[in-house]
């Protein structure tokens, strides 16, 4: 989520067949929902625009490679090569890891840090998605492209959520336009 901006239930639904190393993209085509009585249900993403391709960079490829190596070490090489298996699975080899498990893991890490005197405010896995979006904008990423990566249904939604990141935008853009007209005669 921190490197892709994906929703947690999109990550938990991710299969090795969704990883396209030829075109360097992750195909987001499904999400995991948890039934009220327990159990997993695979569904289509929450909106038409949630079904999307996310570009992969080298960091994402390294994370995926380490995950594949971890699965091979714990569950065997044959299991790790199955294209229809989930990328992130439970310790017992179950099909998908629960989003609650991710939250529990975050809480455990924060607890261990507190024991070492390092206090970090509690956060949820959605903070990784927000951090991705914030850093993307801070690094000059285009808002329309961010909308597509995040799978938002409208540009307005993306702008409403993340425009606070750009407090000096008007000033910066006036400088850019000034630079564009440097040396041009003014009438």
Task: Describe these PLM feature segments.
Residues 1-32:
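Short, charged phosphate-coordinating catalytic segments
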Residues 4, 54, 70-86, 91-148, ...:
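Short, basic (Lys/Arg/His-rich) helix/loop patches that form interaction surfaces
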Residues 21-30, 37, 66-79, 115:
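Proline-centered turn/helix-capping motifs that create local helix->coil transitions or kinks
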Residues 58, 62, 66-69, 104, ...:
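Generic recognition of well-ordered alpha-helical segments
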Residues 18-25, 141-161:
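Short, polar N-cap/turn motifs at the start of nucleic acid-interacting alpha helices
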């Amino acid at each position: 989520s921190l490197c892709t901006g994906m929703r947690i239930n999109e990550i938990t639904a991710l299969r090795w067949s969704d990883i396209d190393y030829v075109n360097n993209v992750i195909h987001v085509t499904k999400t995991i929902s948890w039934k009220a009585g327990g159990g997993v249900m695979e569904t289509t993403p929450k909106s038409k625009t949630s079904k999307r391709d996310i570009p992969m960079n080298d960091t994402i490829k390294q994370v995926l490679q380490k995950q594949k190596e971890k699965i091979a070490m714990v569950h065997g090489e044959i299991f790790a090569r199955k294209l229809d298996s989930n990328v992130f699975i439970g310790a017992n080899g179950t099909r998908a890891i629960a989003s609650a498990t991710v939250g529990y893991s975050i809480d455990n890490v924060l607890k261990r840090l507190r024991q070492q005197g390092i206090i970090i405010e509690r956060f949820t896995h959605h903070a990784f998605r927000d951090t991705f979006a914030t850093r993307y904008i801070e690094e000059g990423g285009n808002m329309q492209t961010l909308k597509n990566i995040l799978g938002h249904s409208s540009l307005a939604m993306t702008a409403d959520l993340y425009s606070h990141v750009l407090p000096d935008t008007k000033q910066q853009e006036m400088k850019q336009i000034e630079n564009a007209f440097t040396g041009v005669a003014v009438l």
